Amino acid sequence: MLTAEDKKLIQQAWEKAASHQEEFGAEALTRMFTTYPQTKTYFPHFDLSPGSDQVRGHGKKVLGALGNAVKNVDNLSQAMAELSNLHAYNLRVDPVNFKLLSQCIQVVLAVHMGKDYTPEVHAAFDKFLSAVSAVLAEKYR
């Protein structure tokens, strides 16, 4: 459960990251593909080389969806319903991959935000990304 303070920290951190969605998203995906190569199986039609147009485009989509989740933090299930359906029924993505990508997003935010990515911000974002992952995995149950 996110506290009011968590939500404030998430919003503040997101304000700093929002203008870098394509860059940060591509970096998080590239990090995931490198660290967890099994995740590449979901992208057989992509050029997965770092900085490719497809990785950048999908990275922008991923972080755009995350931005939507930040805006709708009090109603994640409704805000993420379409993505949850897509990943569960059409793409059939193993839900463990949401956690793997969440870890990579955390690293990218920490690298780019530096000292502004305090332990408190890290903890709040960890809870938030866990909540987003849980919502995306809801349809699997």
From Swiss-Prot:
Name the keywords, alphabetized. Heme, Iron, Metal-binding, Oxygen transport, Transport
The record's PROSITE patterns line, in alphabetical order, gives:
GLOBIN
One term of GO molecular function: iron ion binding
The answer to whether keyword Metal-binding applies is yes
Q: What is the lineage of its organism?
A: Eukaryota, Metazoa, Chordata, Craniata, Vertebrata
Which organism is this entry from?
Gallus gallus
Question: By what name is this protein known?
Answer: Hemoglobin subunit alpha-D
Task: Name the protein family.
Answer: Belongs to the globin family.
Q: Which residues bind heme b?
A: H58, H87
Please give the coiled-coil regions recorded for this protein. none
Q: InterPro entries from the xrefs?
A: Globin, Globin-like_sf, Globin/Proto, Hemoglobin_a-typ, Hemoglobin_oxygen_transport, Hemoglobin_pi
Assembly, per entry:
Heterotetramer of two alpha-D chains and two beta chains. The component D forms dimers of tetramers upon deoxygenation.
